[in-house]
């Protein structure tokens, strides 16, 4: 009866710890990190053994981002995809108010000649054709 209580206690302790993608806990307490390499038919790529789960998870994130880029599923996505602040959303032609009047008129002209460009990824042909048709109808 005691052994079943011990195993349930160990299981509840494991559940309380944060679980990370690509990280396993070794019986002696260290954390191992590995990732599947898509270019080698899913073979395991050993990343190392670490003192903490967070270190192992960050090693996994670095490898995943290097292998899969923006398509990677990460443990800490905010470290690779920072939030966009207001200043990064400003267009490049939004200059300070100290610019001369001649500079502001050229800025106004360039604003009129610019048009918005949206970049879409992984859209099927039908959606792209509809977008192009709607742009042609506007003209």
UniProtKB/Swiss-Prot annotation:
<dbReference type="GO" id="GO:0003700">
    <property type="term" value="F:DNA-binding transcription factor activity"/>
</dbReference>
<comment type="subunit">
    <text>Interacts with MED25.</text>
</comment>
<comment type="function">
    <text>Probably acts as a transcriptional activator. Binds to the GCC-box pathogenesis-related promoter element. May be involved in the regulation of gene expression by stress factors and by components of stress signal transduction pathways.</text>
</comment>
<dbReference type="InterPro" id="IPR001471">
    <property type="entry name" value="AP2/ERF_dom"/>
</dbReference>
<feature type="compositionally biased region" description="Low complexity">
    <location>
        <begin position="1"/>
        <end position="12"/>
    </location>
</feature>
<feature type="region of interest" description="Disordered">
    <location>
        <begin position="1"/>
        <end position="25"/>
    </location>
</feature>
<dbReference type="InterPro" id="IPR036955">
    <property type="entry name" value="AP2/ERF_dom_sf"/>
</dbReference>
<keyword id="KW-0010">Activator</keyword>
<keyword id="KW-0238">DNA-binding</keyword>
<dbReference type="GO" id="GO:0005634">
    <property type="term" value="C:nucleus"/>
</dbReference>
<dbReference type="InterPro" id="IPR016177">
    <property type="entry name" value="DNA-bd_dom_sf"/>
</dbReference>
<feature type="compositionally biased region" description="Low complexity">
    <location>
        <begin position="95"/>
        <end position="107"/>
    </location>
</feature>
<keyword id="KW-0805">Transcription regulation</keyword>
<feature type="region of interest" description="Disordered">
    <location>
        <begin position="87"/>
        <end position="112"/>
    </location>
</feature>
<dbReference type="Pfam" id="PF00847">
    <property type="entry name" value="AP2"/>
</dbReference>
<protein>
    <recommendedName>
        <fullName>Ethylene-responsive transcription factor ERF098</fullName>
    </recommendedName>
</protein>
<keyword id="KW-0936">Ethylene signaling pathway</keyword>
<comment type="similarity">
    <text>Belongs to the AP2/ERF transcription factor family. ERF subfamily.</text>
</comment>
<dbReference type="InterPro" id="IPR044808">
    <property type="entry name" value="ERF_plant"/>
</dbReference>
<keyword id="KW-0804">Transcription</keyword>
<dbReference type="GO" id="GO:0009873">
    <property type="term" value="P:ethylene-activated signaling pathway"/>
</dbReference>
<keyword id="KW-0539">Nucleus</keyword>
<dbReference type="GO" id="GO:0003677">
    <property type="term" value="F:DNA binding"/>
</dbReference>
<feature type="DNA-binding region" description="AP2/ERF">
    <location>
        <begin position="19"/>
        <end position="77"/>
    </location>
</feature>
């Amino acid at each position: 009866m005691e052994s079943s209580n011990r195993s349930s206690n160990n299981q509840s302790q494991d559940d309380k710890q944060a679980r990370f993608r690509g990280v396993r806990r070794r019986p002696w307490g260290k954390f191992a990190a590995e990732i599947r390499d898509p270019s080698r038919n899913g073979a395991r790529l050993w990343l190392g053994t670490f003192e903490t789960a967070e270190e192992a998870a960050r090693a996994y994130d670095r490898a995943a981002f290097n292998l899969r880029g923006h398509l990677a599923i990460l443990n800490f996505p905010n470290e690779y995809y920072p939030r966009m602040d207001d200043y990064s959303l400003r267009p490049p032609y939004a200059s300070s108010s100290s610019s001369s009047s001649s500079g502001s008129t050229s800025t106004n002209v360039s604003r009129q000649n610019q048009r918005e460009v949206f970049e879409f990824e992984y859209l099927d042909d039908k959606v792209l054709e509809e977008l192009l048709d709607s742009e042609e109808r506007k003209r």
